[in-house]
Amino acid sequence: MEHTTLSRGRTDTSAESDAPSLAVAAPELTDALLARMDVPGPRYTSYPTADRFVEAFTAEEYIQALDQRRTGAAAMALPLSLYVHIPFCESLCYYCACNKIATKDRGRADVYLDYLEKEIALVRAEFSTRPTVSQLHLGGGTPTFLSNAQLERLLSMLKSAFAFKTDAECSVEIDPRRLNPGALALMASQGFNRMSIGVQDLDPDVQKAVNRIQPPEVT
């Protein structure tokens, strides 16, 4: 998804910076370079990229990776960054290649949270103390598909298992068409200080073509 990012309490001062330039000269566009780069690849929206999530990576290897962090003094000193995927959408945007489930049944989110709670418990059990978290991002899908009660439950689960830093960056993807009354106040009270608002295109014809009707007044 493409987003317009709004950050509370953050100012871009890059234009006024006295820091030395880190610009790198553009490579020469040779036929050999174009031939090497003109190949398909995964959508680079996250790391590791989607093609790295394969069945060959077993549960045992995942536990081993957690164990390496648990026993490594240097790794334990570094805070975690958490990503929680909320896959539900009331309708599908035709351009989207994210993992999603189209439904209007809010009850499905309760079942999803049940399983997510079990996964959080499994991860927490690998650490002797609550791991420190410096970043949290809720993505989707549509995180604002969750009711306020479901969102509170999710955050309670996370904060019970992890120790969030007081200055943690907590961000959430918001669909302004799917925003419950009081949701913004709830998220602010829970420490969220950054939100990404989906604005794919303001042209009504394009919105119709991609099945995402979002008038400017809604945005």
Where do the protein language model's features map onto the residues?
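Flexible, acidic/Gly-rich N-terminal and inter-domain linker regions that tether
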Residues: M1-L80
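Conserved non-cysteine loop/helix-boundary elements of the Radical SAM core domain that shape
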Residues: K100-T129, V133-T219
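Short aromatic/hydrophobic contact patches that present stacked aromatics
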Residues: S81-Y83, S171
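Structural motif
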Residues: L80-S81, Q135
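Short glycine/proline-enriched loop/turn "hinge" motifs that connect secondary-structure elements
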Residues: A74-M76, H85-F88, T129
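Local cysteine-cluster metal-coordination motifs and their immediate loop/turn environment
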Residues: V84-K100
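Generic secondary-structure boundary/loop-capping signal
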Residues: L34, G41-Y44, A50, H85, ...
